[in-house]
Amino acid sequence: MTNIRKSHPLFKIINDSLIDLPAPSNISSWWNFGSLLGICLAIQILTGLFLAMHYTSDTTTAFQSVTHICRDVNYGWILRYLHANGASMFFICLFLHVGRGLYYGSYMYKETWNVGVILLFAVMATAFMGYVLPWGQMSFWGATVITNLLSAIPYIGTKLVEWIWGGFSVDKATLTRFFAFHFLLPFIISALVLVHLLFLHETGSNNPTGVPSDSDMIPFHPYYTIKDMLGALVMILALLMLVLFSPDLLGDPDNYIPANPLNTPAHSKPEWYFLFAYAILRSIPNKLGGVLALVLSILILILMPLLHTSKQRSMMFRPLSPCMFWLLVADLLTLAWIGGQPVEHPCIIIGHFASILYFLLILVLMPIMSIVDNHLLKW
């Protein structure tokens, strides 16, 4: 009799994806982040579902409902902080996952990579709308500032902003629709994750060397299931440490002040994971130019397969390309730091240089360095 795992229509899909899946024998811990992102998504959907049972998306009661969750609901405080800090953990894993893809040339699987970029946009949109829901000062002014950027679009900009707001300012209609979309998007993200995996399993996984590993494959279970469980354990431990010891470390104190349209915060800034893009936006004096730079800072990832000039897929054996990669990492950290600083000297000029360097590295310096590597290795 055939094993039910291999014959049942549903179990067969799970078996081919998680158990008998042939995987390269040499993939490192950098390949753990896909499964960690899946766990993060599950945590966010579960905690979000329970929070939605107690939250009210009305401007008069939203802030109070979050207070009620933290004070009166059984374990409401841990649900709220798991959800808020779970988003931070989600983005840490996302950035590391994308960074691994850039370093090891995983972007050469174009379909998987493009779906991944769409996923990144969807997660960023979800996180932005989630930040608006507690209806604190940063929530309100963040929503006002970011949605207002769309008014830079010629001809239709102002109408588009008013249509998104559902009125002439950020108000009850805006909060209600943001809650609706914040609830819906994670399920769309889950569907996109399945598409992402579908494309990945069409080609098989990349490996650190960038060399095809068809001749040296091992079953996913037990080798990589155990490895993923260890990664999950470390991540969940880090998340619980953050939630239980310093839950407000990555938040903004201004968001504990109820939203007040008549009082602007001294320094409006988004959550830490948007700071690099916010710094690029702020560094361009023109509003439309800033919005375009903001979108392009993420959309530029789509161009990675076209900008690949090396004869090697991975950066593992290239002498100079890794230097450019780590310069890009340092530049992104600089942008994130600048995004959180007030708009004054010397932060303005550092922001300008870091923004120019970001686009210069991806579009010019990294492709040139790959060509130099080809010559150095006499390829």
Curated annotation (Swiss-Prot):
Heme 1 (or BL or b562) is low-potential and absorbs at about 562 nm, and heme 2 (or BH or b566) is high-potential and absorbs at about 566 nm. GO terms for cellular component: mitochondrial inner membrane; respiratory chain complex III. Binds 2 heme b groups non-covalently. The chain crosses the membrane at residues 33-53, 77-98, 113-133, 178-198, 226-246, 288-308, 320-340, 347-367. PROSITE patterns: CYTB_CTER, CYTB_NTER. The cytochrome bc1 complex contains 11 subunits: 3 respiratory subunits (MT-CYB, CYC1 and UQCRFS1), 2 core proteins (UQCRC1 and UQCRC2) and 6 low-molecular weight proteins (UQCRH/QCR6, UQCRB/QCR7, UQCRQ/QCR8, UQCR10/QCR9, UQCR11/QCR10 and a cleavage product of UQCRFS1). This cytochrome bc1 complex then forms a dimer. It comes from the Eukaryota. This is Cytochrome b. CDD domains: cytochrome_b_C, Cytochrome_b_N. It is a multi-pass membrane protein. A ubiquinone binds at residue 201. Gene3D superfamilies: Cytochrome Bc1 Complex, Chain C. Keywords: Electron transport, Heme, Iron, Membrane, Metal-binding, Mitochondrion, Mitochondrion inner membrane, Respiratory chain, Transmembrane, Transmembrane helix, Transport, Ubiquinone. GO terms for biological process: mitochondrial electron transport, ubiquinol to cytochrome c. Belongs to the cytochrome b family. Heme b b562 binds at residues 83, 182. Its cofactor is heme b. Component of the ubiquinol-cytochrome c reductase complex (complex III or cytochrome b-c1 complex) that is part of the mitochondrial respiratory chain. The b-c1 complex mediates electron transfer from ubiquinol to cytochrome c. Contributes to the generation of a proton gradient across the mitochondrial membrane that is then used for ATP synthesis. Its main location: mitochondrion. One of its GO terms (molecular function) is ubiquinol-cytochrome-c reductase activity.
